[in-house]
Amino acid sequence: MAIAAPLKEKTVQKPGTTVYPILIIIGICHMLNDSLQAVIPAMFPILERSMSLTFTQLGIIAFTLNMVSSVMQPVVGWYTDKRPRPYALPVGLTASMLGILGLAFAPSFITILCCVFFIGLGSAIFHPEGSRVAYMAAGTKRGLAQSIYQVGGNSGQAMAPLITALILVPLGQFGAVWFTLVAALAVMFLMYIAKWYASRLGSLAQKSGKQKKTAENTAITKSVVSALIIIIFLIFARSWYTSAIGNFYTFYAMDTYHVSIQQAQSYIFVFLLFGAIGTFLGGPLADRFGKRFVILGSLLCSAPLAIVLPFAGPVLAYGVLALIGLVLMSSFSVTVVYAQELVPGKIGTMSGLTVGLAFGMGAIGAVALGALIDAAGLTPTMIAIAFLPVLGILAFLLPSDQKLREWHS
């Protein structure tokens, strides 16, 4: 508590300063939140055997988690843009904690879906408000701030393979109960964040008139709509590909390389770990070279690697997955900041739209890819999705960073 007063005083006196302690804490909370979500795909190999679920049913579980989060995130962002709710952050994590607790004891497929609904709802509340906190603490370093925030989430997702290998394989479904402790820790951190957030609202009240005027003067022109549509297509390409790897590459590795669940999960861990590193690097690169440059390079440079992956051997696959994760995910946080600058004054809405859309696209992809695997097999599906990053060529059509500044100057 000793740091609370100096921190508050510093942020009030110097609103343009990057508040690293808050960024680090909200990044840790993002990691804890997304580690709860990571329990779901981590549990797939366990549920597939213990409940005899099909790939389509596993896809429906992923769909429920991601679609609830996807639909609700823009709604939460829109609402809190108008009426900020600092304590929505701990409330959201409490909902996720209840979902995780129920998941540990769920006896049926339907019960699992109900528990996953609560986890998705908690995530939907957390993400736009967490992104807003990162924006408020960013100062002039928006790319770096969003990267710190998003790398926490990607690090949490990267825990899924470790969760499977170290907890769920030896303990089974009941092992999920330990993650109620993770949720409780996140709630404690978020209570502190909420207090800082509430204090910042007071100091920002003097600027609210100017920000409101900026938001009102930001016309949603055809050019803005066109840019948002392109962003949506790029999110689609990235989300479907990462959904395929995150949800189903474990089964591909087990089938193709004849490895155990634990060994197969190591491939996912490498992909997600380097994805987290890429997410962190993307923000500073965007601050230096421009957001459109990073978005374009991220997808186009990962395309040839994605095409090589289905033909790689068991050892080479580690390196290819690491490079794909590093390059492809470097645009994740950058896409959020680009959308926020595309429509200034709508921080929560744009964060909810882009991140929520990523969840939603991943949800649809999980169901579609699960059905495709059931119908065509694992290998043909992995070859087919390898061409998704090629859609990154659409980023050439995005307005440059300079053009965005001219639109809103």
Swiss-Prot record:
Subcellular locations according to the entry: Cell membrane
Listed CDD domains: MFS_FsR
The keyword Membrane is assigned to this record: yes
Main localization, broad class: membrane
Topology with respect to the bilayer: Multi-pass membrane protein
Protein name, entry field: Uncharacterized MFS-type transporter YfnC
Keyword Endoplasmic reticulum: no
PROSITE patterns reported in the protein's UniProt record: MFS (PS50850)
InterPro entries to which the protein is assigned, alphabetical: MFS, MFS_dom, MFS_trans_sf
TM helices/strands, residue ranges: 22-42, 58-78, 99-119, 174-194, 217-237, 266-286, 293-312, 316-338, 353-373, 378-398
A molecular-function term among this protein's GO annotations: transmembrane transporter activity
